[in-house]
Amino acid sequence: LGSFRLSTNSTATSDELGIMAVAYFERFGYRAEDVKACIIGSVVPQVMYSITSAIIKYFGVEPLVVGTDVDTGLKFDPRCYETGRLGTDRAVNCIAALEKYGGPFLILDFGTATTLDAVSREGVYLGGCIPAGVQVSIDGLFQKTALLPRVELVKPDTVLSTTAVGQIQAGAVLGYIGAIEYLIRHAKEEIGQPDTKVVATGGLSRLVADNTELIDVVDPQLVLDGLRIIYERARR
């Protein structure tokens, strides 16, 4: 029906969040009273109270919050050292991919940080890794060096650029894609299942997927599908 992205503001009040959400819903042709149910998955504890209060006040529904008391249905390999402590967004991604594509698969979520998660053919979470996101690398260069400029996040035409901007883009973007390809290859080797699918999601998924042959599926709405699946299971 529609989706929108907002930057996180941990100091936003429930009124600010509620008014903003109502305005975005109206842009898609819906009124607040059209909303009959809500589910929230957050990895920013500071905003949970404000978001929950906003949903109750402006939409009149009690949201289901995906937390430790909500069974996502994801199984964990016993070797995982923090079973059940996987970030909400990552667990939700895995549930969605299991339902939509089946295991085995790797999920790469390209956000502020990049996360890679592996799930077996039997639907068991095997582990993952968290490299820094490409935007973090570019911002770090800008903040920690006096003369290097902040640059746009685009793929350059060459590794050997003749400008400072192009060289930063080559190092950050092309270097990042190379690192992602390395992680995919080695994760597949560790899983040992040749038919492992690679699913990309998150804001930068298209940039990476368009420049590598190792990603099978780009699914920008994966986490939203996962939240829907969890809600439907919880309400059965």
What are these regions (language model features)?
Residues 39, 105-109, 199:
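Short glycine-aspartate micro-motif
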Residues 53, 61-65, 70-144, 173-186:
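Phosphate-binding/catalytic loop of phosphoryl-transfer enzymes
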Residues 1-72:
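N-terminal glycine/serine-rich phosphate-binding loop of ATP-dependent small-molecule kinases
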Residues 4, 8-10, 156-197, 215-217:
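Adenine-nucleotide phosphate-binding core of ATP-dependent small-molecule kinases
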Residues 91, 146, 173, 206, ...:
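Glycine-rich phosphate-binding/hydrolytic loop that grips phosphoryl groups
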Residues 41-48, 195-215:
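Glycine-rich phosphate-binding loops at beta-strand->alpha-helix junctions
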Residues 1-28, 123-149, 154-158, 166:
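Short glycine-rich, Thr/Ser-proximal phosphate-binding strand/loop in the N-terminal lobe
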Residues 60-74, 213-229:
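Conserved phosphate-binding/catalytic loops in two-lobed NTP-binding clefts
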